């Protein structure tokens, strides 16, 4: 395995263990922060005839998540009302969705998105897959804790009752957040063994040994798997993504593809999802909002750079073309600038 690959692997992981604001986030803590003043200004904005959305957007998209929690606390102390409820009544449409998302902690936001993906008839597998495949161990463990707190049931139980077959097994294994952490020692023998096992369990045989794929892809560290997928190419005529498309179908195929893309390059994975949410006619606002809200303090700067590199125009430009009004303003602030 080349040293270059090892360095790239290390670089791709920095800033990844990131519920705390990361160096690659577009939203930073506001320097002259005053929760009381912000709470008062938001209260005035809500009371203004027609609602002063601009002030609400300016404040909440330019504060860190921690600062927003302080504003919500100060607002409740001032008015004896919950800030989220007040804003829910004052705002509507996509802007409301963005602002209410920003008021939740990262784990509360993910937990509520997961719950919504499994509520009612049918499952929104796309959202379930995106969140479960892209979060770190630490993030998943916090999501599990908060999910139980919010909904009085286990995330795993809800996943089990809403999914089936191998797709269920994969989602349950990932949701536990028990993947090995990246170590300083590189085990080349195990890399080779895993690459061969993935090939033997899939492309090489008739039918697929899905449990073998699940165990390797949900238990090994991200850095280890990046090397495994490289090594895999020396055994298989197809790369890992092509092999998945040949071997499995439906939700399971979609989940494995998302997972491998996240492991290979998470910022690029999100750049692709953002592009897909805006290309062609109509916008898949739910996906667009979720990524802009959830990655703004994690790796938005990396996502922007991957987006520009792959699609030739900036993420900022695409958002400008695809959205309008104060909703657009909020997303552009979260994007953090043009490239």
Swiss-Prot record:
User: According to the UniProt entry, which residues carry Phosphotyrosine?
Assistant: 24, 199
Q: Where would I find the Annexin repeats?
A: 33-104, 105-176, 189-261, 265-336
Sorted keywords for this record are: Acetylation, Annexin, Basement membrane, Calcium, Calcium/phospholipid-binding, Extracellular matrix, Isopeptide bond, Phosphoprotein, Repeat, Secreted, Ubl conjugation
Q: Which residues carry this modification: N-acetylserine?
A: 2
Which InterPro entries does this one have? Annexin, Annexin_repeat, Annexin_repeat_CS, Annexin_sf, ANX2
What's any GO biological process attached to this entry? positive regulation of receptor-mediated endocytosis involved in cholesterol transport
Cite the post-translational modification comment: ISGylated.
Q: Name one GO cellular component term.
A: cytoplasm
Miscellaneous note, as given in the UniProt record, is: It may cross-link plasma membrane phospholipids with actin and the cytoskeleton and be involved with exocytosis.
The name this protein goes by in its record: Annexin A2
Gene transcribed to yield this protein: ANXA2
């Amino acid at each position: 395995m080349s040293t270059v690959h090892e360095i790239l692997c290390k670089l791709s992981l920095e800033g990844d263990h990131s519920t705390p604001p990361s160096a690659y986030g577009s939203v930073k803590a506001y320097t002259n922060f005053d929760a009381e003043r912000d709470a008062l200004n938001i209260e005035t904005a809500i009371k203004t005839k027609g609602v002063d959305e601009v002030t609400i957007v300016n404040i909440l998209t330019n504060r860190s998540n921690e600062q927003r929690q302080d504003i919500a606390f100060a607002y409740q102390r001032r008015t004896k009302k919950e800030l989220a409820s007040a804003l829910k009544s004052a705002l509507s449409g996509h802007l409301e969705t963005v602002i209410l998302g920003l008021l939740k902690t990262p784990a509360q936001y993910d937990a509520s998105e997961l719950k919504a993906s499994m509520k009612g008839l049918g499952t929104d597998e796309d959202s379930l897959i995106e969140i479960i495949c892209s979060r770190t161990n630490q993030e998943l463990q916090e999501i599990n804790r908060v999910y139980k707190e919010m909904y009085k049931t286990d995330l795993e139980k809800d996943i089990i009752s809403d999914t089936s077959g191998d797709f269920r097994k994969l989602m349950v294994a990932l949701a536990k957040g028990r993947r090995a952490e990246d170590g300083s020692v590189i085990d080349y023998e195990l890399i080779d063994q895993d690459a061969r096992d993935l090939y033997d369990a899939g492309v090489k045989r008739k039918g697929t040994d899905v449990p073998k794929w699940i165990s390797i892809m949900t238990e090994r560290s991200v850095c280890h798997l990046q090397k495994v997928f490289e090594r895999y190419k020396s055994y298989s005529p197809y790369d890992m993504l092509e092999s998945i498309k040949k071997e499995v179908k439906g939700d399971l195929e979609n989940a494995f593809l998302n997972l491998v893309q996240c492991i290979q390059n998470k910022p690029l994975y999100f750049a692709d999802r953002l592009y897909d949410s805006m290309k062609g006619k109509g916008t898949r606002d739910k996906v667009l909002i979720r990524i802009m809200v959830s990655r703004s303090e994690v790796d938005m700067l990396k996502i922007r750079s991957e987006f520009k590199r792959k699609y030739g125009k900036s993420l900022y430009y695409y958002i400008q073309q695809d959205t309008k009004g104060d909703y657009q303003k909020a997303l552009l602030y979260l994007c953090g600038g043009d490239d």
